[in-house]
Amino acid sequence: MFRRRTRRGGADIHVADPTYDDWAILRDFEDLETGLAFRDQLRDAGIKAVLTSDWELDRFRRGDIALRVEAADYGDAEVLLSGLDDA
């Protein structure tokens, strides 16, 4: 199990980590920077979110990246990212 670390000590992406296999996939991304932006939006809203990949990213920080949330938070996360939240 591998993790790429942020400057703040948290994991940017969880690689080959089965811990999050039961979490719902909300979006897929090809580059880490875009994935981090979406993940951080969810975290700022109080939703637990992580980025996962089955394989290491390439040298350009690209790969098959999944944005995951806990199943109970899927609906709220989808509404937030879709811009449909009226509140």
Give the ranges of each region predicted by the language model.
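Acidic/polar low-complexity segments and flexible, solvent-exposed patches
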Residues: 1-87
